[in-house]
From Swiss-Prot:
One Gene Ontology term from the biological process aspect of the record: protein secretion
This protein's record includes keyword Membrane: yes
Name under which the protein is recorded: Translocation and assembly module subunit TamB
SUBUNIT field: Interacts with TamA to form the translocation and assembly module (TAM).
Species whose genome carries this gene: Haemophilus influenzae (strain ATCC 51907 / DSM 11121 / KW20 / Rd)
Sequence similarity: Belongs to the TamB family.
Length: 1298
């Protein structure tokens, strides 16, 4: 029992260890479950499509900033997400569709396989102002090391389409991106052939917002020591090799259609760059970087490059780059011409890198040299050779030109030595010069060992130094040898030699400019000229001149002294002969000027005289300035200026000028006397100045101005006061009087920052205007009352009331005089509160009245229009005084218009009518018996209706206009008539039916429509007998075209004077009843023509048929059997196809036809003589001229035929002359001609003694028999005729017409 009980006593303690192990084991199990269950759960969920979808939906619910509209598929076969949105502070993202496909089977081979990653229409908007501040990056970047990847990555299909990114005011779009990438330890990073197309970047540049000016911060001095320290270490430092994390393989990256645009707030393009093509190919193998190809084609130019770089060892380098730069333009102007640039880099980066740069274009240059990037301060040795270069920096200046320039630069970044040689010229102020420079320098200083310049027909040499370490310091010496300064001062072509020395400083501590030595001498206009002296300027003493002397021939100027708060400066001049010093300057000047006291209020002593001064258009016979002015406690002094015979140009001639000023502040007087043309003034001013109150008071008296319109005087002394504190003047009431004008200021007025001036023109005789324009056109008087006022806190005010009675205007036009009588005229103008009201009432010749009431509100900004304008029965008969006897114009103008809108967009309402138009003018082809034209205005548009009546026809006019947009106004006018009769004296009578439309806008004037001519009778007198044709080689010297060919080929105006392009498309239909009688041609016409004009080219198209025609040629009367004129472009170059035959009635054999064919271009047609049936040319010509053959040439008849033809050919040109002779003797229609055939031919003279009685006399050419014929018309178709010859015959004739 004991043994059994004993263990029971210890039972509570013995189980402690087993219980602890149990709880530990339990805790481990629970912790593992907490970690592994979610991981395994997520992994399990990602293994199935449903799990993947559930996880995405869970994230969508848990995150407010993330949402997905639709989820399809799974990662293994392709997970598709639609309308994915993500939003955070400053960033909004939207993806229309995303597809992601993974191959989980690749994980077993330690590879991540991304089969597809496609984004469609991703949109990203970023507002940088809302982005949270980024945390500072305190990490230090170490050297790059090779990376060993635990797993490979293979992305087969990476696609992005229609990407849109907006970052503040910059918009970026990407049309298409397609690529594939693989990354592993064996091959590194391989980017498969990649396409990046249709990139567009649009940057909007906002106008700068004016910010409040900030207090200026003192400029911190440049820390040159820090700059030197930063430039001292080698550029490559201790870089022994460049290690890439992995190899890189880029078979090809290509891009097409890339574009960059900078626009303003209105969307207007400020800058545009287009890159049409980009190709890049690169590779790294065995620590060698190879650029196989880089090619860029863009609007800026083309670039191509290739090369290689070893990334270890001495880093050998071999790189070539070639580019062609297109002309660079800004605001349509070329700022950089086209250029070619070739760059070659070779050598090694660790030792010496050689470079070669060649340019061609704006600069034809070659730069060669080497730099040592791995050495401290980067030692360099460069040579630049420029064959030629030219560039225009300022459009108004000549371009800068450099030629044969060589620059050698050796040393390093901190210490350098430069040698320069070359030629330079241009920029208007740089003469052709040869420059040679030898200098040493540092970052902050330069020492010029020698600067030689061969220019201006001489030489100059400079030595010295300049330093800008602490402000600016310089010390320069110059030696000049025979330098001609005519290039800079053409009117002073002096040749100078000598020495100049300048030194000084400028900085925060002050400034000083010192010229310790100035010793120049030379020749000017064959006289010696010299300058010797020294001068100093600084912030304490404005100017110190120990001694300065300038001599020119016998002329000299001497200056010495000090200008500061205690000035003591004297200037002496004695120039008895200034000829040759400056341009055409001549004359004599002598005197002295002394300045003492404080420079701001100096004391002056003046004693200068001159005589016979002449400079260009200025002439002065004699002048003097004498006086003393003391500006101590109380300003006082005396000054006298006199001048005699002062002439300038051909208009200003002052015979005498005398200005005398004397007194002090308390009591002073100014007297001005002058005589001359066109204006001379005489006046006296007495005044008093109170320095304490800063007020001046005085009177202007004895005022008289001699002007082209006569003497102008004041009616009294004028009291004037001025308050300097208030900037205000007060002028007492007074009047200005002239024989034609009297201007009065009826009450005292103020003028200053604000003022109020009432005025009154009591009388304005319009003869004053006649004197000014040197014509006698106006008569009458005007009266004007008004007031003008201006203020500091509101707009100015102005009122004027103009009244005129019995006004007249006359103007000679040729031999006539146009007179216009205006019995009464009133004009009232009022500007109040920035609004203008203009009222007018004009009675015109007691035959009409013009009444206006026009408002223009808000003059400063909107300028709103309002008011009315009425024209009451203005009679057009006013113009009859310009017409000849028997001519007249009648009608009346009636209008009532109202205005609205503003000046930029005016609105007009009302009517404008011209009624009862009647004209009878010799210069017009029609007389108007009644006509009306009515314009109707409705806001920003109008319509036109018109009707023009003649005795037997009428013309209709319609039209419309629109100016809703004043810059793009439109108008249209149509003219239409039916058988409108036109009578052109001594030329033509015709009936035509036009339907023509004219359209116009600011850019184009368009004429179109049709013109039908059903009936016309055109008769043009032939040229006079003595007229000779224009020679083929004649040129017109005073015309715009110089030869016949240019006249034919000339272009008509393509644009109007206002810039509108002229276009026309007009069809002309010539009817069947149109006849022409001109220059021996009698025929009927018909056809269709089209007139077209575009861009200055006037074209005529179509054809005209000649029917029933007769033509006098070769001394014969020819019948037109066939006539066709065709136009296919130039109106002066039609194609002719005309066939004219001899009248069969005059042929010996009526079965034979002889004639002329004219075929070809009018300028050079082919003319042939033909016969039917066909005969030799001599026979055909004989038939054409004589009507018979040449076969019986020995017969008398044949000889008579030839003689008759020759006589006929001669007298065919004399009809006009014979007719003129007949008129002298009272015989109408006297003409000379031939009749008969062969040896029966006669010469006949016929004419009308009265309208009924005709006489004809004929003489045989070969038989000499005379014949007299008298014919009397009893009735229109019945004649009595008597023929007296070898026999006496009486006939009674009746005429039939078929």
């Amino acid at each position: 029992m004991t043994e059994q009980i004993q263990p029971s006593e210890t039972s509570p303690k013995s189980p402690e260890k087993p219980n602890k192990k149990h709880w530990v084991r339990k805790a481990v199990c629970i912790g593992s479950a907490v970690i592994l269950v979610p991981v395994l759960g997520v992994a399990g969920a990602l293994s199935f499509d449903a799990g993947q979808k559930s996880l995405i939906q869970l994230v969508d619910k848990m995150l407010d900033s993330f949402s997905v509209e639709q989820v399809e598929g799974g990662l293994q076969n392709g997970l598709v997400l639609k309308n994915v949105r993500y939003q955070t502070a400053g960033i909004e993202t939207h993806i229309a569709q995303a597809r992601l496909q993974l191959d989980f089977g690749c994980l077993f081979s330690r590879e991540v396989c991304l089969r597809d990653f496609t984004l469609n229409k991703p949109t990203i908007a970023i507002n940088t102002a809302l982005l949270p501040p980024s945390a500072p990056d305190n990490s230090k970047s170490g050297s790059m090391k090779r990376i060993s990847l635990p797993i490979s990555i293979n992305a087969e299909n990476l696609v992005m389409q229609d990407l849109s990114v907006n970052i503040d005011q910059t918009s970026i779009t990407l049309g298409n991106f397609k690529s594939a990438v693989s990354l592993n330890n064996e091959k590194g990073l391989t980017i498969a052939p990649t396409e990046i197309n249709d990139i567009s970047v649009i940057a909007k540049k906002l106008s700068e917002v004016k910010s409040e000016p900030k207090a200026e911060q003192p400029n911190k001095p440049v820390d040159w020591a820090a700059i030197e320290q930063s430039l001292t270490p080698a550029f490559l430092g201790n870089v022994s090799e460049i290690i890439l994390p992995f190899d890189l393989h880029i078979p090809e990256i290509s891009g097409k259609n890339w574009q960059y645009q900078a626009v303003n707030e209105k969307g207007e393009t400020l800058q545009s760059v287009e890159m049409s093509s980009l190709i890049a190919q690169a590779d790294t193998v065995d620590n060698q970087l190879q650029l196989q190809k880089l090619a860029v084609e863009s609007s800026l130019g083309n670039l191509s490059s290739q090369g290689k770089l070893q990334l270890d060892g001495d880093m050998p380098l071999d790189l070539t780059l070639k580019s062609h730069l297109e002309p660079l333009k800004s605001d349509g102007k070329e700022i950089l011409p086209a250029s070619d640039v070739d760059l070659t880099l070779s050598g090694s980066l660790k030792k010496s890198t050689a470079l070669s740069l060649k340019t061609k274009g704006v600069l034809d240059a070659e730069l060669n040299g080497n730099v040592q990037l791995a050495q401290d301060k980067m030692p360099l040795n460069l040579t630049l050779n420029v064959a030629k270069g030219q560039y225009t920096f300022v459009n108004t200046m000549t371009p800068l030109k450099i030629n044969d320039v060589t620059l050698k630069l050796t040393g390093d970044l901190l210490n350098y030595h430069a040698e320069l040689k070359g030629d330079v010229a241009g920029m208007n102020y740089i003469p052709a010069s040869q420059v040679e420079l030898n200098a040493d320098g540092k970052l902050y200083e330069v020492t010029v060992n020698k600067l030689g310049i061969d220019s201006l027909d001489g030489k100059s040499e400079f030595v010295g130094n300049a330093n800008w370490k602490n402000g600016a310091n310089w010390d320069i010496q110059a030696d000049l040898e025979k330098m001609n300064i005519a290039f800079f001062v053409p009117v002073m072509p002096a040749t100078l030699s000598g020495k100049l020395h300048s030194r000084g400083f400028a900085g925060s501590q002050g400034w000083q400019v010192e010229v310790p030595v100035a010793d120049l001498n030379g020749m000017l206009s064959a006289k010696p000229i010299s300058l010797k002296g020294s001068a100093t300027l600084n912030q304490n003493v404005l100017l110190t001149v120990p001694d300065l002397q300038i001599k020119y021939g016998e002329n000299y100027l001497k200056a010495s002294g000090v200008l500061d708060d205690h000035s003591d400066f004297a200037l002496d001049i004695n120039a008895p002969n200034l000829r040759g010093l400056w341009s055409d300057l001549k004359g004599r000047v002598k005197g002295r000027v002394a300045i003492s006291g404080q420079i701001t209020t100096p004391n002056l002593d003046l004693d200068l005289t001159s005589s016979n001064l002449h400079l260009q258009g200025f002439q002065l016979a004699k002048a003097s300035i004498k006086g003393h002015i003391n500006n101590a406690s109380l300003s006082s002094g005396k000054l006298n200026i006199k001048a005699e015979q002062l002439h300038y140009g051909g208009n200003i001639k002052l015979h005498l000028l005398d200005l005398d000023l004397s007194g002090d502040e308390q009591n002073h007087k100014l007297i001005l006397k002058s005589q001359g043309e066109p204006v001379a003034a005489n006046l006296q001013i007495n005044g008093h100045f109170d320095r304490t109150l800063e007020q001046w008071k005085g009177t202007i008296s004895q005022v008289k101005f001699e002007t082209p319109i006569g003497d102008v005087k004041s009616n009294q002394a004028i009291a004037v006061s001025y308050d300097n504190k208030q900037t205000q003047a007060n002028i007492a009431s007074h009047c200005w009087q002239n024989t034609d004008v009297e201007l009065c200021f009826p009450q005292a007025f103020n003028a200053g920052k604000q003022g109020n001036i009432p005025f009154q023109f009591k009388r304005v005789n319009l003869d004053l205007v006649n004197k000014l324009i040197e014509q006698n056109s106006l008569k009458g008087n005007l009266q004007v009352q008004g007031n003008v006022a201006w203020f500091t806190d509101k707009p100015f005010q102005f009122t004027a009331n103009v009244d005129g009675n019995h006004l007249a205007f006359s103007q000679k036009l040729d031999y006539r005089t146009f007179k216009l009588y205006i019995p009464k005229l009133t004009l009232n103008a009022d500007i109040q509160n920035n609004n203008l009201v203009l009222k007018t009432d004009i009675n015109v010749h007691n035959q009409g009245r013009i009444v206006g009431d026009i408002h223009l509100n808000d003059l400063a900004k909107n300028r709103q229009l309002g008011g009315t304008l009425a024209i009451e029965r203005l009679n057009l008969s006013i113009a009859n005084q310009l017409l000849t006897s028997g001519e007249s114009v009648n009608g009346e103008v009636v209008s009532k218009l109202s205005f609205g809108g503003n000046l930029e967009k005016p609105l007009l309402n009302g009517d404008f009518n011209i009624r009862n138009i009647r004209t009878k003018l010799k210069s017009m082809p029609v007389n108007i018996t009644d006509g009306d034209i009515a314009l109707r205005f409705n806001d920003n548009r109008s319509t036109l209706q018109g009707k023009i009546k003649t005795v037997d026809s009428h013309l209709n006019l319609t039209g419309r206009a629109n100016w809703a947009n004043i810059e793009h106004w439109t108008t249209e006018l149509n003219a239409q008539a039916n058988n409108f009769n036109v009578d052109i004296p001594s030329m033509a009578k015709l009936r035509f039916s036009p339907n023509i439309t004219i359209k116009a806008n600011p850019k184009e004037l368009n004429l179109s429509g049709t013109v039908d001519i059903p009936w016309a009778r055109i008769k043009i007198d032939s040229l006079p007998d003595t007229a000779e044709p224009v020679s083929e080689d004649e040129v017109i010297l005073n015309g715009p075209h110089k030869s016949k060919e240019e006249l034919i080929k000339r272009e008509f105006a393509a644009k109007t004077k206002s810039g509108m392009e002229i276009r026309s498309d007009l069809r002309i239909n010539i009817g069947k009843d149109v006849s022409l009688d001109a220059y021996g041609l009698k025929t009927n016409l018909d056809g269709l023509l089209s007139v077209k004009q575009d861009k200055g080219n006037l074209g005529l198209f179509g054809q005209i048929n000649l029917t029933k025609g007769r033509y006098a040629s070769f001394g014969q009367d020819l019948l037109i059997r066939k006539g066709l004129i065709s136009f296919s472009g130039q109106a002066t170059q039609p194609t002719l196809n005309i066939e004219a035959i001899r009248n069969p009635e005059t042929m010996e054999d009526s079965k034979i036809t002889a004639g002329v064919r004219v075929i070809g271009i009018a300028d050079s047609p082919e003319v042939t003589i033909f016969s039917e049936p066909s005969k030799p040319q001599d026979q055909a010509l004989s038939y054409l001229l004589t009507g018979r053959s040449l076969e019986s040439s020995g017969e008398v008849g044949s000889t008579g035929s030839v003689g008759a033809a020759l006589i006929g050919l001669g007298i065919s040109k004399s009809g006009k002359l014979v007719g003129s002779i007949g008129e002298v003797f009272g015989i109408q229609d006297l003409n000379l001609g031939t009749s008969g055939v062969g040896d029966k031919s006669k010469v006949t003279v016929s004419g009308n003694i009265t309208n009924r009685l005709q006489i004809k006399y004929g003489v045989g050419l070969f038989d000499g028999l005379a014949e007299v014929t008298l014919r009397y018309r009893l009735m229109p178709q019945l004649y009595f005729q008597s023929v007296s010859s070898t026999n006496q015959v009486f006939d009674l004739l009746y005429k039939f017409e078929f």
